[in-house]
Swiss-Prot record:
PROSITE patterns: AA_TRNA_LIGASE_II. This is Asparagine--tRNA ligase. It is an enzyme of class 6 (ligase). It comes from Buchnera aphidicola subsp. Acyrthosiphon pisum (strain APS) (Acyrthosiphon pisum symbiotic bacterium). Pfam families: tRNA-synt_2, tRNA_anti-codon. Homodimer. SUPFAM superfamilies: Class II aaRS and biotin synthetases, Nucleic acid-binding proteins. It catalyses: tRNA(Asn) + L-asparagine + ATP = L-asparaginyl-tRNA(Asn) + AMP + diphosphate + H(+). Gene3D superfamilies: Bira Bifunctional Protein, Domain 2, Nucleic acid-binding proteins. Keywords: Aminoacyl-tRNA synthetase, ATP-binding, Cytoplasm, Ligase, Nucleotide-binding, Protein biosynthesis.
Amino acid sequence: MNRVSISDIYKDDIIVNSLITVCGWVRNRRSSKSGFSFITIYDGSCFNSIQVIANNTLPNYYKEILHLTTGCSVMLSGKLILSIGDKQKYEIQLKKIKVLGWVENPETYPISSKKHSTEYLREVAHLRSRTNLIGAIARIRNYILHSLHHFFYKEKYYWVPTPIITSLNTEGAGEMFRVSTLDMENIPKNLDSSVDFKKDFFGKESFLTVSGQLNLETYACSLSKVYTFGPTFRAENSNTGRHLAEFWMLEVESAFTDLNDISDFAECMLKYVCKSLLKKCITDINFLENYTNSNIVDRLEKFLLVDFVRIDYVEVINILLDSKIKFNNSVFLGIDLSSEHERFLVENYFKIPVIVKNYPKELKAFYMRLNNDKKTVAAIDILVPNVGELIGGSQREERIAILDERLLELGLKKEDYWWYRDLRRYGTVPHSGFGMGFERLISYFTGITNIRDLIPFPRTVNNAYF
């Protein structure tokens, strides 16, 4: 018989009354008084499950079918028919079923058919993808990534892999994970008692990357338009639903562009993905609407119609001050906008996405282009409702003299960035780029606010299980 997926069935790709084979897991089973069992099967290929009708005349009905419980894996064959009920479009009249795997003790099965809290599901992350919630998120996550790759292919961008292990601190912050093979019980020391990293695997102090941007810029200065996508790491000791120690980042770099170019491009990218998602994942999104009790579809359709607000940092400060709201974090010129400031701006004041630009140079990294006023840099943050900052970007500093000044101001050694500085010495070019936290994008599209539920195996403070 022809093996098919449940998604194939619901795409109307399978002829009614044809004999098919489906492999999957039991969601639930119930018996009728008339000698039938109704088995709900899912295979993860789509949100929908399918009902299978098993007659008690089947040879293994009493020995096996009546003992099927949530989580059992099966391979079944039967006739695809139109359902006479209004809860589903199709059913399968069972001809044959083989149990591939039993649940050892149904009473203690961690993912029973009842609804579980997300807190509990994080404790059984190896099984939680079997639930409707995490399954829907996984499919949406996959399609968002697929859509992003398709967008960049369409826009003639090249994908470039960037290293996960690095000796550079891209963001100039201290929150990095060190990579070392040194014996922790016998660490080699220099005469001044500092660690002798020359004895380490890479011959110098090395870390897990916080960004692939600097490496990506090297390819932007030869291929013109490039992007990368991969895991990044922050050793930030923050145990909240907004932070992960390991998360996925999309980074984009483009030569011969300025701040306005990348602002327009980022907005176009987000709307392309949003439109594709509404077209391809509507069943999963409808489920999440009910789960979160929010109007996700209406919100995303509005997102497609509005133009993002573009506003200078100074104007944002004035809006916050004029609001007369007593924020937890004080508002004054020169502050780094906190999450509450960002969300007030997009959720209460404008109520649509906002691009904040031209930040004080003290708030931003060394590689951001210094504006003519010598006080601000050509940087942007794209803020969206319910999330806050989604994208951070800038026009990169292409002038080596000013780049060196910024490195000095921030206490960074220009010798460590010799190859990055070479880009400014050999055919320098105006270029710009941005980075986007992938899980934050998923959060915006799904309405799921805790970022730990948006990545298969969250890595957080005191948690590296699975």
